[in-house]
Amino acid sequence: MYYTKLNYLVIFSCFLFFIQSLVLKSQTFKLKREFRGAYIATVSNIDWPSDKNLSSEKQKTELIDILDKLKAAGINAVIFQIRTECDALYNSSIEPWSYWLTGKQGRAPEPFYDPLEFVITEAHKRAMELHAWLNPYRAVKNNNSYPLAGNHVTNQHPGWILKFGELKILNPGVPEVEKYILNIVKDVVERYDIDGIHFDDYFYPYTPVKNEDSLTFKIYQSNFTNIQDWRRNNINNLISDVYQLINSINPKVKFGVSPFGIIENKYAGTKGFESYKVLYCDPLYWIDKKIIDYISPQLYWEIGHKSTDYGKLLPWWSSVKDSRHLYIGHFSSRIADENYSGKKSELGDQLRMNYQIQNVNGDIFFSAKSIVNNYSGLADSMKFFWYEFPALLPEMNWKDSIPPLAPVNLKSEKIIDGIKLKWSEPDSARDGEYPRYYLIYCFKEDEDINLGDPTKIINLIPAVQTIYIDKRLYSGKRGNIYIVSSLDRLWNESRQFSITKIDK
């Protein structure tokens, strides 16, 4: 095979990423519980589908390939974009099918299938969470880029729309707009077995609002005299009402938001864009009022950046997370890209820093393609170093603290392929829940049984399976004591477990 100078440079960069991960491995904490998320962005076909005109079968094949590669890299949660521009990548009676799915807004996939239902099923097969990602306000990303369907909200309710150049958004100050968004969330939570609802950073637009909503303010200002405070209140009301709505329908469904990483510069000594003053979002209010389950700030800058230093923002966010989960957003598609001009070790350095900050509960990578396409060896580094062992998602005891019962009748036997484990499903726990997953550990005979040690976890499987075959062939690596525990939907682990010993 012929290698150019560029080929060698790319290979060498990947090699450096591997070596750096190896060196740092001894310095990192192996955690039994952490959120390892990846965004699957559908707008502009960033991650999926690769083209707007694919057949349904090709779309499914691509999605399965993405999930398989994310799973192999150790990812345990997927943030799947289902609403990009007041459209739907699911079967909605409220909004039109997405242009990014079929090449024509309002046209369903042919042959028909429901992408959200499909990705939920496939994610759960792999013991991965599936969070439905919605852009709450964005209606048109780029005006006139494609024809809008007749039932698009801009055609149905033109009075709800604010325009900023080529961008159109739903007006957050109009009460009917919030009702409309809540109805969409309600529809998704009621009809789909999702694990979470996720909002990103798009509230009021990055193009600063001037007087576009001044008339709305006059009509709906209530007791507010300051339009900036009124705008923030509009966003806060939406976040609060979404949280209450989700809990009224299914309290096991999580709600998280990934805001822009800087609220105000005064907090972490930064000199960047302030989302509190432009996007009018107030994450500290959401955390204080406990109207979200997790916060995932987009810390898309480098450690040591002169104006927006990751190294300053991370500890600040960890200090304000309170009792909610903190998952750090990484721009892996940029800083792991082979053409990235910064340090090749940047992403590894960020992960190491996260492990050193105890209040960080996990990470979310934007976007999936950086892992699927193994940018700079990222997927390999995850698989063999950072995420070498499966991880459970962090518990949310404010939502559910009742553990499931342990599996029963665990038996083991040697077969040609390895060691076969078989067990039975337990009764329901006192909250009525059955196991959603099973966790399998393996210990050597001379080892202490420590279920807090994630290096002893060999697999995490969906509860539809009650048979598992350990196919690891190297007897020196494989122990002979197997333990199986149960996990419920919110990752509470059974207090008891089943144990079996196989003769060497």
Language-model-detected regions and their locations in the chain:
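Active-site-adjacent "subsite" loops/lids of carbohydrate-active enzymes
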Residues: 41-61, 132, 137-191
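Catalytic domains of carbohydrate-active enzymes, especially glycoside hydrolases
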Residues: 61-87, 191-195
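Aromatic- and acidic-residue-enriched segments that line the glycan-binding/catalytic groove
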Residues: 88-103, 138-165, 201-222, 268-274
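Active-site neighborhood of glycoside hydrolase catalytic domains
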Residues: 176-323
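Substrate-binding cleft of secreted/luminal carbohydrate-active enzymes
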Residues: 283-284, 288-306, 322-399
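Pro/Thr/Ser/Gly-rich low-complexity, intrinsically disordered linker/stalk tracts
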Residues: 377-432, 491-504
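Solvent-exposed loop/turn segments flanking beta-strands in beta-repeat/beta-sandwich domains
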Residues: 426-454, 479
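Beta-strand-rich modules
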Residues: 470-494
